[in-house]
Amino acid sequence: MAVCAYSQILYHGATISAFSDTLLVNRFKGGIRMNDFSTDVKLARGGDSAAFARLYSLVYKDLYHIALYSLRSSHDACDVVSDTVLDAFTTIGKLKDEKAFRGWIMKILSAKIKRKQREYFANTAELTDEELPEEEFGYENVELHEAVERLDPQSRLILSMSALEGYTGDEIAQICGMNAATVRSRLSRIKERLRLELSGT
């Protein structure tokens, strides 16, 4: 899977360069993240760029995977992630609950993805196969790839957050500004639709 080589943020003359090959990936058990962001969020709110870089390293892969799965373009995914991180870096001082960092930055990402998707629909020119290379997604199952492609953009976003990154229905609801019961119901319908399509019934 293609990844962004780096994301560079400029803010009041400070520069953060976070390279993808040195990322410290956050692991989770049962969909519950085990990292406590509190200390670094407090430092980042005070202008500590190194603390923000550490926060970035813990969420980058989640951000990129969700953006790529939703937008189906590595270039656009990198752009959306870069915009998300820039916004987060410049507004982290407004984040009151340190433990809410992950959900907060995912909300920013969700808004950026939706904006990019609106740009797609506004553009009447169709994208070529070269602009959407299937190998970026690493789908071994062609039928699954095609079934996911037929989902609407919001369904792909919800599915990616659940299946790829392990977010719970409540977490997805909070990030996307939806009702938790609606998210769980929609996830169930999405999975059932994929199951039926793949089984040929």
Question: What is the predicted function of each stretch?
Answer:
Residues 56-74, 91, 148, 197-200:
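Amphipathic, Lys/Arg- and hydrophobic-enriched alpha-helical face
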Residues 2-33, 43, 174-175, 191-201:
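C-terminal edge and immediately downstream basic/flexible tail or linker adjoining helix-turn-helix-like DNA-binding
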Residues 45-46, 82-100, 119-120:
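Sigma70-family region 2
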Residues 110-111, 164, 170, 175-201:
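DNA-recognition helix of helix-turn-helix
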Residues 93-97, 106-126:
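Arg/Lys-rich amphipathic alpha helix in sigma70-family domain 2
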Residues 37, 115, 119-148, 168:
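Internal acidic/polar
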Residues 35, 41-65:
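A short, charge-rich alpha-helical start-of-domain segment used by transcription regulators
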Residues 158-162:
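A short pre-motif secondary-structure segment
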